[in-house]
């Protein structure tokens, strides 16, 4: 699950609502809320990057008094599609939110240059946590939802972050703006994203702009 972190592009062909098998929201006496679900999407675009075609994206979450813990994954039907598994710990109050996400991708990421000038790549093994070899990316988020506009800032602070042209860690960051609106009797959102400085984590882009109008789930 990527909070505002995963923008899906394309028509959602099927929504696998598991509420018929497992209640989508379970309320205990201590007010703990849990949710489970899955989507089948025709294409997976994340922050302007094409990570695959038709994909299954399950999610699981639990929250209590603004504190939340969630798991989200994506598996494509093609062997070349990116596989992903994320864990997010977050806190929100009013419109304010902060979170830390552990992303894991099965693709290798350029993480630096060694003393011989050779490029260093991260491994794609899940349980590998070496400082310069892990496939995990750790990201911090801070944001505020003003109602007509939500603003979120994300920065990678550890793990398989991208690098700048000089081979130094980029602390890759992303600014996301999201605005809801109504059209044709449906609720929609328009998302605008920007990469503020160069980084191989976003394919070397600087100031990448990405927009994605999409239906908004109001369940």
Predicted regions and their residues:
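Transmembrane beta-strands of outer-membrane beta-barrel pores
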Residues: 40-44, 64-66, 73-77, 93-95, ...
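Outer-envelope beta-barrel architecture signal
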Residues: 30-36, 54-56, 65-67, 85, ...
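Short glycine/proline- and aromatic-enriched beta-strand/turn motifs that initiate or cap beta-hairpins
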Residues: 28-77
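Single conserved hydrophobic/aromatic residue that forms the stacking wall/gate
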Residues: 210-219
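Outer-membrane pore/translocation modules
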Residues: 81-172
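Cleavable N-terminal export/targeting peptides
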Residues: 1-33
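Solvent-exposed loop/turn segments connecting transmembrane beta-strands
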Residues: 46-54, 74-84, 132-134, 156-172, ...
